[in-house]
Amino acid sequence: MNENNIQKLQKIIEHYFIKQQNISKNNIDLNLRNTVQEVIDNLNNGILRVSEKINNKWITHQWIKKAIILFFTITNNKLMTWGNARFFDKCPTKFENKSEEYFKNRKIRIIPPATVRYGAYIANNTVIMPSYVNIGAYIDTGTMIDTWATIGSCAHIGKNTHISGGVGIGGVLEPIQANPTIIEDNCFIGARSEIAEGVIIEENSVLAMGVFISQSTKIYNRSTGHVHYGYVPSGSVVIPGSLPSEDGKSSTYCAIIVKTVDSRTKNKIQINNLLREYCN
């Protein structure tokens, strides 16, 4: 999609988003409906994405988030079926009409009862175990989303990344947050961890089981003694821990960077790549 078309879509979305409170489902402008659907279709196909790295900096396209919110504003709930189960929602599932050839050609594995909403992008050579991927999320190639993990709206999961069982990656629609959560390329997120509120996990990082990071979580580097917030530097190995209060009477949870990724760390998580090779 060329820049002129993107700017045209953005202009229309911005215009209608200002008037969101006045939009009625009984009288929706055709231009609005078509524009919103075009944005959602392009998110679904990976042509558009909510966040992208430009000049080594993550940029969030706020207008695309607004398009998703408008989609829910103008769309009615409808009955959906899966076997004997019944669902009632606004957003269809991504793969409901896809053929066997579609999955084979793209080397995508979807294990029941995984749910991927339409408007999420799933790249080639990916494995989606029984998990949940929300609208606007972007899952890049070579990545596995493991059992009972949840990928929130507009989250970005990079290439060759493993999101372990029960992990939660926060979204940005409910509640509305400024920036999506970003997991960059070649990361390993340990089971039952939670990353939310626009936190960025930079490439080649490994998080142990049960690491919780939000914007207010202290991230403590054991080697330097430095504390920062909102991101994990590239190549970090992170475990859950705590820091004492100034008076020594209590302690507060934090994420601790214990070292940088080395060959020993890589060997421990190499089994995931072997499993994917044999499963495709």
From Swiss-Prot:
* EC identifiers of the protein: 2.3.1.117
The reaction(s) catalysed by this protein are: (S)-2,3,4,5-tetrahydrodipicolinate + succinyl-CoA + H2O = (S)-2-succinylamino-6-oxoheptanedioate + CoA
A Gene Ontology biological process annotation? Answer: diaminopimelate biosynthetic process
Broadest EC class?
A: transferase
Q: Which GO terms describe its cellular component?
A: cytoplasm
Q: Binding residues for substrate, per the UniProt record?
A: 109, 146
Q: Which pathway does it operate in?
A: Amino-acid biosynthesis; L-lysine biosynthesis via DAP pathway; LL-2,6-diaminopimelate from (S)-tetrahydrodipicolinate (succinylase route): step 1/3
Supply the name of the protein: 2,3,4,5-tetrahydropyridine-2,6-dicarboxylate N-succinyltransferase
Indicate yes or no for the key word Transferase.
yes
Q: How does it assemble?
A: Homotrimer.
Give UniProt keywords alphabetically.
Acyltransferase, Amino-acid biosynthesis, Cytoplasm, Diaminopimelate biosynthesis, Lysine biosynthesis, Repeat, Transferase
Source organism? Blochmanniella floridana
Family assignment from sequence similarity:
Belongs to the transferase hexapeptide repeat family.
Query: What subcellular compartments does it reside in?
Result: Cytoplasm
Among PROSITE patterns, the record links this protein to: HEXAPEP_TRANSFERASES (PS00101)
- Predominant place of localization: cytoplasm
A single Gene Ontology molecular function, please? nucleotidyltransferase activity
**Per UniProt, what is the name of the gene that codes for the protein in this document?**
dapD
In terms of Pfam families, this protein maps to: Hexapep_2, THDPS_N_2
At the top level of its lineage, which domain of life is listed? Bacteria
